[in-house]
Amino acid sequence: MRRYIYLLLFVLSVCGGMVTSCSRHEVRFRIGVSQCSDDEWRHQMNNEMLREALFYDGVEVEIRTVKDDNARQAEDIRHFIEAGVDLLIVAPNEAEPITPVVEEAYDRGIPVIVVDRRILSEKYTAYVGADNYEIGKAIGRYVSNMLHGKGTVVEIAGLAGSTPAIDRHEGFMSVISACPDIRLLAKEDGAWLRSRAEERMDTLLLSLIHISEPTRP
């Protein structure tokens, strides 16, 4: 996660370099940031961006955060479009509902940086995030090794419509499906929330009695 922050700070430093000749307090470069959630690492990202912006006269950063609400995030992005921001940074909640408004910003000539989660088109300027398909494959290999290629598993995934959850599941299944003696019993949506993941797991443990335990060394 810190890699995302460092890359975004680099973007801010470049933007700040474009306006260093501005007089103090004159806003010349506006950055709009649309966050999909307000968990701890996103708070850190927001604080680092705001702190970096303080080093440059004329740079203003406005951050709007929603709690996993697609409609509200679309409204926030449209607010930034109408405000005429010079740069838009978006961490999409779910890809499909947020794609149209991000495309609208891009079509209006606003540079768009998509962070952590992708959208369903190529209408953005840059993407800062992990290779979630490879992460899913790594998890699949780990599970296969722990079970010695034989057993039953359940998957508690992230928010169903978010691209990291989609990509990680596909990467995971690309490995597991090649193991004929490993069977996926169920897949549940944990929505990136620990409490919800625990709740889903408790329900599965009550309803499923054949979840394999890894072999201990």
Predicted segments, located by residue:
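Bacterial N-terminal signal peptides
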Residues: 8-17
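Residue-level detector of conserved catalytic or cofactor/ligand-binding positions
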Residues: 209-217
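Flexible loop/hinge segments that line or gate small-molecule binding clefts
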Residues: 95-134, 145, 152, 158
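Signal peptide-proximal N-terminal region
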Residues: 47-63, 177-182
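Short acidic/histidine-rich motifs immediately flanking catalytic phosphotransfer sites
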Residues: 80-87, 208-209
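C-terminal motif of bacterial Sec signal peptides marking the signal peptidase cleavage site
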Residues: 20-21
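Bacterial N-terminal signal peptides that target proteins for export
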Residues: 1-8
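Hinge/beta->alpha junction and helix N-cap segments in small-molecule ligand-binding domains
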Residues: 34-46, 62-72, 94, 117, ...
